């Protein structure tokens, strides 16, 4: 391998994929009531436990990865003289990216020739995972880190993240969206559709009456703007996968789509979205506006 790849637990990557491609993944922690859980490894919190606690009214929150955790991992790669690329959770949603930059500076003081590169994906959930997977493809095809970074600088601004959340109050409580947006979502049968803006922050793009219409609009917009050089969709969900599988079925009937993958959102993300979330990720022809 030409370089090592690292990301965090928000990327919705399966343990199988992480192991198969030799990825390093750091996990944020999730606190449910008075109990704090890991989100990576055999003892990781699962979504069914988390959603059951949320349904019962438990207070839940996440804690970002701190600079000390990054420092420990970065030093391991630096001391082994290995080249590392860390793809970080959006700086518009968490301080994790800044923590990584602090750790990077500290490592360079001790190992001036360390090859540690930190990239802000400006993405979350399977959008971040999408970028990790494209990075893996590039690395495994023999591309250098420099060549890979050139591709990432092109596709990161064009990554589209569109989603619908059943209960926006979870995002509002975590400060991810304004409370006024969440209030609209409580109105009868009104579904605000959200995306991730160019700075990696969540925003409302429109309001649709009815869940089915909202989901159809998510899919249609993703397909309409898709770059045919990246003919794939990632569909993520919280709770049951019934709706996500139906979206996949619809998408696979469209001309030009070669790959549609359905996967659960990670507990780190579900903590902020709750049950009933549907998200669609794709690479668009144009940059986010």
UniProtKB/Swiss-Prot annotation:
Residues 3-284 form the DegV domain. GO terms for molecular function: lipid binding. Hexadecanoate binds at residues 62, 94. Keywords: Lipid-binding. PROSITE patterns: DEGV. Transmembrane segments: none annotated. This is DegV domain-containing protein YteA. The gene is yteA.
């Amino acid at each position: 391998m030409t370089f090592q790849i690292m990301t965090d637990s928000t990327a919705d990557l399966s343990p199988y994929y992480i192991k198969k491609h030799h990825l390093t993944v750091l996990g944020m922690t999730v606190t449910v009531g008075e109990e704090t859980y890991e989100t990576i490894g055999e003892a990781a919190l699962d979504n069914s436990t988390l959603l059951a606690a949320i349904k019962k009214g438990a207070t839940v929150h996440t804690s970002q990865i701190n600079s000390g955790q990054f420092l420990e991992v970065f030093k391991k790669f630096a001391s082994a003289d290995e080249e590392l690329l860390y793809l970080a959770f959006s700086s518009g949603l968490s301080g994790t990216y800044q923590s990584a930059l602090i750790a990077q500076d500290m490592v360079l003081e001790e190992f001036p020739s360390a090859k540690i590169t930190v990239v802000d994906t400006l993405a979350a959930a399977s959008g971040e995972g999408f970028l990790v997977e494209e990075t893996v493809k590039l690395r495994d095809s023999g591309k250098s880190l420099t060549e890979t970074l050139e591709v990432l600088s092109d596709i990161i601004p064009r990554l589209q993240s569109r989603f619908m959340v059943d209960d926006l109050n979870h995002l509002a409580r975590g400060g991810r969206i304004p409370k006024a947006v969440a209030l609209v979502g409580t109105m009868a049968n009104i579904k605000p559709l959200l995306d991730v803006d160019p700075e990696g922050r969540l925003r409302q793009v429109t309001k649709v009456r009815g869940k089915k219409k909202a989901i159809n609009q998510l899919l249609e917009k993703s397909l309409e703007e898709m770059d045919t050089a990246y003919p794939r969709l990632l569909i993520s969900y919280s709770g049951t996968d019934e709706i996500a599988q139906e979206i996949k079925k619809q998408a696979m009937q469209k001309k030009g789509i070669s790959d549609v993958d359905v996967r659960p959102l990670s507990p780190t993300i579900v903590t902020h979205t709750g049950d009933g979330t549907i998200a669609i990720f794709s690479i668009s022809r144009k940059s986010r506006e």
